[in-house]
Swiss-Prot record:
Name listed for the protein in its UniProt record: Ferredoxin, root R-B1
Cofactor, free-text remark: Binds 1 [2Fe-2S] cluster.
InterPro entries linked: 2Fe-2S_ferredoxin-like_sf, 2Fe-2S_ferredoxin-type, 2Fe2S_fd_BS, Beta-grasp_dom_sf, Fd_pln
Sites where the protein binds [2Fe-2S] cluster: 41, 46, 49, 79
Remarks, miscellaneous: In radish there are 4 ferredoxins: 2 are root-specific (R-B1 and R-B2), one is present in both leaves and roots (L-A), and there is a minor form which is leaf specific (L-B).
Similarity comment: family membership: Belongs to the 2Fe2S plant-type ferredoxin family.
Residue intervals of the 2Fe-2S ferredoxin-type domain: 4-95
Organism: Raphanus sativus
GO cellular component: chloroplast
Length: 98
């Protein structure tokens, strides 16, 4: 399987970069890397873990909460997102969804 570099940018501009294999959810990999991210259901059925993709592609077909218009703007549920390329994601974006 492939491994991609994922950079997360938090609300205060802090950056964390770590490797994520293409069969691991970004949230799980972030926790393993010691990065503290918001989450609730861990099943893609709420919006607590939402982020916004600045660069790159994910597979988040396991999620159910976001709709097409969210995907078109780059929003991502990190708890059900597999990386499909190197990524830059801004985290803590739940309040922007509504």
């Amino acid at each position: 399987s492939a491994v991609y570099k994922v950079k997360l940018i938090g609300p205060d501009g802090q950056e964390n970069e770590f490797d994520v294999p293409d069969d691991q959810y970004i949230l799980d990999a972030a926790e393993e890397a010691g990065v503290d991210l918001p989450y609730s259901c861990r099943a893609g059925a709420c919006s607590t873990c939402a982020g916004k993709i600045e660069k790159g592609q994910v597979d988040q077909s396991d999620g159910s909460f976001l709709e097409d218009h969210h995907f078109e703007k780059g929003y991502v549920l990190t708890c059900v997102a597999y990386p499909q390329s190197d990524l830059v994601i801004h985290t803590h974006k739940e309040e922007e969804l509504f």
